[in-house]
Amino acid sequence: KGVSNATINEIYKQIKKTNLTDTNIADIMQLEKDIDIDLCIARRDIADLYEYCLACGKKVYLISDMYYKLQDIKHLLDKCGVTIPDDEHIWISCEKKCDKVSGSIWKEYSELVGKDIKCLHIGDNKTGDVENPAKYGIDSYYIMSAKDMLMNSSMAELASHVNTVSDSICLGLVISKLFNSPFALCSTNGKVSYDDSEIYG
């Protein structure tokens, strides 16, 4: 509370006020990072589009509202098999101290990068990734997150049966497979279909 665009270290500094030891804090913070790295999965259609744009010589920026710092983000990208761009092409809210949801990061982007050029942003948050960029003349393309795809699919009822952390993890693993592609529901009117036996299993 009271910490805007905080880094993970700043967040855990606040948690330390609950009288946890430095060792406890370090262990819990590392556990959070390890779990995120283990569970993080690239959305292949979007990752492939990103790689294609790089191959075509396009300037691509990765912009995220996130409490992980640059090295952690690069570790996540590497784990997911995504080409890591130069540091200046990764904008993270906790390091920039401005963000997508408030729109402040788009103001800076439009002044430093997007001036007098055509830009397209792709994201899954209607406010931070669509409405706010538009205020600064930045075009956007909205894709649904896997969670939003679930809630707009024929399997939406599953969400009401999530009662525990284990349930949440299991559902996350399911939707990461079913809705890895943000276009998975485009031709089915929201009905979930299985293209191969691995996904069905």
Please provide the spans of the model-predicted regions.
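Substrate-recognition "cap/lid" segment bordering the active-site pocket of phosphatases
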Residues: 61-118
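Non-catalytic interaction/regulatory modules that flank or connect domains
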Residues: 191-201
